[in-house]
């Protein structure tokens, strides 16, 4: 495995353990050249999942795009990387469980928001504001009110 730090082609596995309910293997590696430690994940390769974007174009599903959006939404919030990875895993599992090779970006956004709402309200609102592209303050306020109603019914 190539080192992300020095790009040397040799590393050794320091630790290896199952993760994601046994569907993946997490490996902790150390570069034999510079000693840099990094983590890799090994998963079974799935059939490609295509995302139908709002403009009708299609692109391959990319877990990293969701993770980057979550990281941005959860900035300076008490949301761990593990929680965000878990959301991405859960969303991907939901998409694959549907059994379709193509899924709309809208469906992906809704899945992400439903999971994020259970983790952190502020991160949810941040994600929703970008995803739903609120046009004005009234739409934003309506989303907050809807969220507050759901919160009251939980208690």
UniProtKB/Swiss-Prot annotation:
InterPro entries: ATP-cone_dom, NrdR-like_N, RNR_NrdR-like. GO terms for biological process: negative regulation of DNA-templated transcription. PROSITE patterns: ATP_CONE. Keywords: ATP-binding, DNA-binding, Metal-binding, Nucleotide-binding, Repressor, Transcription, Transcription regulation, Zinc, Zinc-finger. One of its GO terms (molecular function) is ATP binding. A zinc finger (unnamed) spans 3-34. Residues 1-10 have a biased composition (Basic residues). Pfam families: ATP-cone, Zn_ribbon_NrdR. Its cofactor is Zn(2+). Binds 1 zinc ion. Residues 49-139 form the ATP-cone domain. Residues 1-21 are annotated as: Disordered. The keyword Metal-binding applies. Belongs to the NrdR family. Negatively regulates transcription of bacterial ribonucleotide reductase nrd genes and operons by binding to NrdR-boxes. NCBIfam families: transcriptional regulator NrdR. This is Transcriptional repressor NrdR. It comes from Lacticaseibacillus paracasei (strain ATCC 334 / BCRC 17002 / CCUG 31169 / CIP 107868 / KCTC 3260 / NRRL B-441). The gene is nrdR.
């Amino acid at each position: 495995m190539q080192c992300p730090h020095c790009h040397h082609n040799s590393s050794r596995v320091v630790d290896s353990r199952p993760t994601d309910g046994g569907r993946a293997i997490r490996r902790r590696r150390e570069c034999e050249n510079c000693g840099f430690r990094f983590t890799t994940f090994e998963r079974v390769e799935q059939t490609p999942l295509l995302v139908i974007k709002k403009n009708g174009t299609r692109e391959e599903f990319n877990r990293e795009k969701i993770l980057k959006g979550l990281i941005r939404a959860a900035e300076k919030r008490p949301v761990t990387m593990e929680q965000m990875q878990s959301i991405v895993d859960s969303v991907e599992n939901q998409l694959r469980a549907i059994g379709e090779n193509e899924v709309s970006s809208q469906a992906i956004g809704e899945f992400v928001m439903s999971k994020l709402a259970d983790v952190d309200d502020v991160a949810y609102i941040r994600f929703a504001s970008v995803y739903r592209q609120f046009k004005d303050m009234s739409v934003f306020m309506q989303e907050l009110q809807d969220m507050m109603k759901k919160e009251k019914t939980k208690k």
